[in-house]
């Protein structure tokens, strides 16, 4: 039976924290003019590869997102070097960066639900909002 919270999960959490610190403090690439957030890291079972999921602040522009991912890909070797100094791992995973649009999609879905609820309340009218108030005991 596999461990519920094994080594790959622990390494992935630590990598997420360390990569976020490195991106904030060490990477000075002008292509990363926007703030980068590490939303998750998936590490292979042998700890040789890691998929790093990132989001960008002000990520409305598709070209800026692609440029940011390209900059992160170009800096991945340097990031691995810094990770090797910060973490005690025999093998520092090879990093591949991916854009994580789940936050954007979550916000979009939340706005849709809010709009539907608002439209539903407008259709019902003020008299039907609280049916309990009209009842006398």
Curated annotation (Swiss-Prot):
Gene Ontology molecular function, alphabetical: ribosomal small subunit binding
Cellular compartment(s): Cytoplasm
GO cellular component labels: cytosol
This protein's record includes keyword Protein biosynthesis: no
Domain of life assignment: Bacteria
GO terms, biological process: maturation of SSU-rRNA
Keywords linked to the UniProt accession: Cytoplasm, Ribosome biogenesis
Main location: cytoplasm
PROSITE patterns membership: RBFA (PS01319)
InterPro entries, per database record: KH_dom-like_a/b, RbfA, RbfA_dom_sf, Ribosome-bd_factorA_CS
Gene3D superfamilies: 3.30.300.20
Keyword Endoplasmic reticulum: no
Entry function: One of several proteins that assist in the late maturation steps of the functional core of the 30S ribosomal subunit. Associates with free 30S ribosomal subunits (but not with 30S subunits that are part of 70S ribosomes or polysomes). Required for efficient processing of 16S rRNA. May interact with the 5'-terminal helix region of 16S rRNA.
Alphabetical list of HAMAP family matching this protein: RbfA
PANTHER family linked: RIBOSOME-BINDING FACTOR A, CHLOROPLASTIC-RELATED (PTHR33515:SF1)
UniProt subunit comment: Monomer. Binds 30S ribosomal subunits, but not 50S ribosomal subunits or 70S ribosomes.
Family: Belongs to the RbfA family.
Protein name: Ribosome-binding factor A
Organism of provenance: Erwinia tasmaniensis (strain DSM 17950 / CFBP 7177 / CIP 109463 / NCPPB 4357 / Et1/99)
């Amino acid at each position: 039976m596999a461990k519920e919270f094994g080594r790959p999960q622990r390494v992935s959490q630590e990598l997420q924290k360390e990569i976020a610190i490195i991106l904030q403090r060490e990477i000075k690439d002008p292509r990363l003019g926007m703030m980068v957030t590490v939303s998750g890291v998936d590490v292979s079972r042998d700890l040789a590869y890691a998929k790093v999921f990132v989001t960008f602040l002000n990520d409305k522009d598709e070209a800026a997102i692609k440029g940011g991912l390209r900059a992160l890909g170009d800096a991945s070797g340097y990031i691995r070097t810094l990770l090797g100094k910060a973490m005690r791992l025999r093998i520092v995973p090879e990093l591949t960066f991916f854009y994580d649009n789940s936050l954007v999609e979550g916000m979009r879905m939340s706005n849709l639900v809010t709009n539907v609820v608002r439209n539903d309340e407008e259709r019902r009218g003020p008299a039907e909002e609280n049916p309990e108030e009209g009842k006398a005991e």
